[in-house]
Curated annotation (Swiss-Prot):
Entry protein name: Potassium channel toxin
Location in the cell: Secreted
Coarse class of the protein's main subcellular location: secreted
Tissue spec: Expressed by the venom gland.
Family: Belongs to the short scorpion toxin superfamily. Potassium channel inhibitor family. Alpha-KTx 21 subfamily.
Keywords: Disulfide bond, Ion channel impairing toxin, Neurotoxin, Potassium channel impairing toxin, Secreted, Toxin, Voltage-gated potassium channel impairing toxin
Function: Toxin that blocks voltage-gated potassium channels (Kv).
Disulfide bonds: C6-C25, C11-C29, C15-C31
GO-annotated cellular components: extracellular region
Entry comment, domain topic: Has the structural arrangement of an alpha-helix connected to antiparallel beta-sheets by disulfide bonds (CS-alpha/beta).
Molecular function as annotated in GO: potassium channel regulator activity; toxin activity
Length: 34
């Protein structure tokens, strides 16, 4: 599932590592803090 809890900075870093923008992270990874 793309819905998960995580550190927003780590989520952004992870998505950028996959060649995605942080907006992709917010919309798909659904990073919601801890």
């Amino acid at each position: 599932t793309p819905f998960r809890y995580c550190n927003p900075r780590n989520c952004a870093k992870e998505c950028q590592g996959r060649g995605k923008e942080t907006t992709y992270c917010d919309e798909v990874c659904k990073c919601s803090g801890w």
